[in-house]
A protein has these predicted regions:
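Acidic-aromatic/histidine active-site loop/patch
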Residues: 1-32, 192, 200, 269-284
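Short, hinge-like loop/turn segments at secondary-structure boundaries
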Residues: 3-6, 79-84, 189-190, 218-221, ...
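C-terminal boundary of histidine-terminating zinc-finger modules
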Residues: 242-258
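Conserved catalytic-core segment of NTP-binding enzymes
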Residues: 127, 131-234, 239
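Walker A/P-loop phosphate-binding motif and the immediately C-terminal alpha-helix
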Residues: 26-73
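Phosphate-binding loop that captures ATP/GTP phosphates
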Residues: 55-115
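Hydrophobic/aromatic-enriched cytosolic interaction surfaces used to assemble or bind macromolecules
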Residues: 87-90, 225, 258, 263-284
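Flexible beta-alpha connector loops of hexameric P-loop NTPases
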Residues: 87-92, 122-128, 177-178
């Protein structure tokens, strides 16, 4: 077991980039990925945590942003808490610079992923408006290749701001009927908002092949193709979560970890495809 953990940490260290993003400037090319599930308990924070590790490298630095401003616990999933949080950036949205942002971010030591935490006090969640949240995300585009936002199941001002600015929405469901029903409601809303369906990457989480409803059936019901499945393995996922260790680091060869790595590749391919379409439309 110790050898497996050592191997996993070694692989994570290879994937990890520099702790600091000073001097980096990506223009406005960083991609904003919003992780959303319209039903609580579907695993959005767990996915955000591990997807961040899967996408991060020295060439493609990642920041994860806790958009659950009232009850966010993203930093605990990395076991990496700092003294500052998103409310320290919100009032300075028009005057952000790399140094100011880096003072607020916390870097996960074993992966290199940067973390922008939610406020620890419930009452402080009201200090961040949707406009201010958008300003922060736009600035993070200059510093990181991927900005991954973990959001709650409520469509509050901050989540709607994230949907509006996101390059890609990772929409999570499970095999539960209420979750699938809520996905249909969310898809109806995004259609009304004019969100291109190619900007939505549909993921089936906690997949149990013993259950009668499968990915194809869910795709038929929601009229959105399921682009990835993460198998259920609570005996593997929950202990790692309780220790504050991304499971993708603890054991990258587990089937759940492999599924996250595979989904990360699907995500990168979709972003590249959407970029090509956008370039073609601009040229014509």
């Amino acid at each position: 077991q110790n050898e497996k953990l050592k191997e996993a940490n070694t692989q994570a260290a290879v994937r990890a980039g520099h702790s600091s993003t000073s001097g980096r400037n990506y223009g406005d090319s960083g991609k904003i990925i919003l992780v959303f599930s319209p039903k609580g308990g579907s695993g959005s924070t767990t996915l955000t945590t591990n997807l961040g590790v899967a996408l991060h490298s020295e060439e493609t630095p990642v920041v994860v942003v806790d958009g659950k401003l009232q009850f966010g616990d993203l930093s605990f999933f990395y076991n990496q808490q700092g003294p500052n949080n998103v409310t320290d950036l919100a009032p300075r949205g028009n005057e952000l610079d790399h140094q100011v942002v880096e003072e607020v971010l916390v870097v996960h030591e074993s992966s290199g992923v940067s973390i922008l935490s939610a406020p620890p006090q419930l009452e402080r969640s009201e200090e961040v408006s949707g406009v201010e949240f958008s300003q922060i995300l736009k600035y993070l585009r200059r510093m990181f290749s991927y900005i991954i936002i973990d959001t709650g199941s409520n469509l509050d001002e901050v989540t709607l701001a994230g949907i509006d600015i996101a390059d890609l929405i990772v929409l999570i469901t499970t095999q539960d009927i209420p979750a699938i029903k809520n996905v249909r409601l969310f898809m109806n809303l995004t259609d009304l908002l004019g969100v291109d369906r190619n900007q939505i990457l549909f993921l089936l989480n906690k997949f149990d092949k013993r259950r009668s409803i499968n990915a194809d059936r869910i795709g038929d019901i929601t009229k959105q193709t399921v682009m990835g499945t993460i198998p259920v393995d609570e005996k593997f996922v929950i202990p790692a979560m309780d220790r504050g260790i991304p499971f993708i680091i603890e054991n990258p060869s587990n089937s759940v970890s492999k599924a996250v790595f595979k989904f990360a590749e699907v995500l990168k391919e979709r972003i590249a495809e959407n970029d090509q379409v956008e370039e073609f439309e601009l040229e014509n």
